[in-house]
Amino acid sequence: IDGRALEQGKRFILHFGACDYKTEVWVNGEWAGTHVGGHSSFSFEITDLLRDGENVLVVRAEDDSKNLEQPRGKQFWKQESASIFYTRTTGIWQTVWLEPVESQFIRQVWMTPDVDQKMIGMEILLDQKTEARLKVEITYKGTRMVCDTVTVLNGKAVREWKLDQNLNLEWEHKSYEWTPEHPALFDVHYKLECEGAAVDEADSYFAMRKVSVENGTFLLNNRPYYQKMLLDQGYWRGSL
């Protein structure tokens, strides 16, 4: 760790994509946190546990094969695999990374598309319950759809935008809707400002997609969509 980053007030978030099943984390001998669940992502702020130069990270992962109430998919609870069950596994199985952030940053954004109303709704959550301004720009195939500034109060904001002002022809031909054959995506750029200074920026994307069921028929964007529902499954002798 570069000591200058610590001196400049940077905060450091340690992210785990997933670790099976119960995870305990220590940094430089100090406990950082515990997470239970083998498929969900999690993170810990470890700023106060870091020191300039080399740091030691210890991760302990436990998967109790005797606990039959624990979600495990098809992992076998016995020592050796048998029948259709998978080999027992434990530990980190998704990416782990360290993220430097400012004292205030965008923690999470929930995006909810409304195909029928041609709208996108967003719920924005900052790391701290403070007041800030968030600039949001939405583009589609390079065309700007939304350019707005949201006032964030108490660390949270909720906003909806209409998306059809500049895409009348596109909306008529449904080319904006996401399907497996035409995976159309809208790009989003966020810029967070506190006291007039930019403190965080992030890029994301979303799709205009609606999934529903009517009279027993699966619908994608209000139209019947046939699903093959195939399972392609294999076993590798060296592991499974």
Where are these regions (language model features)?
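Secreted/periplasmic carbohydrate-active enzymes, especially glycoside hydrolases
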Residues: I1-L240
